[in-house]
Amino acid sequence: MATTVVPGFIPSRSGFRFPNAFPDVPLRRIGIPGVVSVPIGDASNGLCGGMAFAARDYFEHGSSPPADATPPSEGPLFDYIVDRLVDSFALPFGPARYLELMNPVLPDVETVWSRIGWAPHGRVWRMGREEWPKIRADIDSGHPSPLGLIRVKSTDPFDLKENHQVLAYGYNLEGGRVTMSLYDPNRPRSDHVTLSLDLRASGTWTATEMTPSGAPVFSFFRVRYTARTPPSED
């Protein structure tokens, strides 16, 4: 149970009712109307970042997302979620953040060289020292905090789609262990998704897990959020 929460944010009411399980349709089409239309992207790969950003948009505009239980395949809401997905990647440099943290060469914990500044800090140091304070500041100031979750170690850019995005809206800090409460687009209407990290981990560390899914998370970081006005339902 989170002891500090964003007032009024509850995933079952503040998140989308449908899951991050979109049909196999292109994200965009480019071309000449009536002559050629080329499909770009595939919604079935997931739009979690767009859903996380959009959920915060609706919340901060004092409204709830549409009550639809089926993911859209076209129309204003679909286009809006796709636009927010693009925003969540902070192009052109945003994907490099994922690739850096996915790289198997990056250590999980500190090494002799990283402790003296001669090598990059490991994943645990970055989560605890760099990312967690920013996430906590968001929540303490009443804002859900978008997180990028690293769920694969790989140098293959095509594995970017294996990662995930969520919204942290609460936390419990006990000793050196923090447990964050999350809105997970993969688990609509669930108020019980959490992610934990032992901030004291140093010598050894294993991937933390999201509950109740049990999915491994090798690292996380706060995603820079920019606000947009959600579409009208009219």
What are these regions (language model features)?
Residues 124-182:
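Active-site-adjacent substructure of cysteine-protease-like catalytic cores
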